Amino acid sequence: MTNQLEEKIKESKQIILDNYSKDDNACFLFSCGKDSVIVDNLLKELKVRDFIYQYYIATGFEDDGILDYLKSRPDVTTIGIDAEKYMREHKCFALSSYIKKLYKENNIINSKFLLSCCSYKRQVLSKYLNKYDIVFTGVRKDDLYNTKTWVKSAITIKKENKKIISPIFNWTEEDCYEYIKENDIKLNKDYDTLGFTRSCLICPIQYNTTENLEKIKQYYPKLYDRHMNLIKYLYDNRRDLQELFGSLEEFKKAFLNKDYYYDKVKEYLEKEKK
């Protein structure tokens, strides 16, 4: 193990010990991804994991890798949340109805929370988890845009002094895989083939490299086709969608202001035609 990783492990454990005691009312948002598994192992090593409620938040698009992994973890409670019940944006109802129609007409991946992940994390979870004083996450600072808007440091202080604690916030991707190898940690089987999980495939921002798209195409061709249907639809109709859902900030940020990504996709599609 490198000295750099040893120092980061010490730092992460100290963050946990300095901000949590067994008397605290705490929970852990367990995603079944590699980062969550690492935090889970750190909590276990510190002998505090059994005192923390562990939740997997169901999105309606759980792949078999995640479902199989959850079966091996009876200590993790799976919960589903009605996003429309918690979201403040009145247009989410119109958005939901519109998407159901879009699914059928364009053979697009069906997910309950499609187009609302950012709202879901900031609005839904913040309300649902309000009863806890501390929420642990596996978020890292080099995570994607929508995650970084929710957690911006290893310790995020919320209203009434509630905390979001992300012990491995400063870890790199290399740190994570070194720790996993050193501790012989079992991951979701998707990591063996793809190197990531399929659970966020519904988000065009998540897989914004042609390399990732090629992996999806190789191992899950039907899923790839439906994902590309979504991307092409959003690209072709982005101006109309902006007019229709102009006040839904999360929708605009996630899909309509990302022209640089759609240009990449357009280029990729043109190559496929040749």
Feature roles, as predicted:
Residues S21-N25, E182-K274:
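ATP/NTP-dependent adenylation/nucleotidyl-transfer catalytic domains that generate, transfer
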Residues M1-N183:
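ATP-dependent adenylation/nucleotidyltransferase module used to activate substrates
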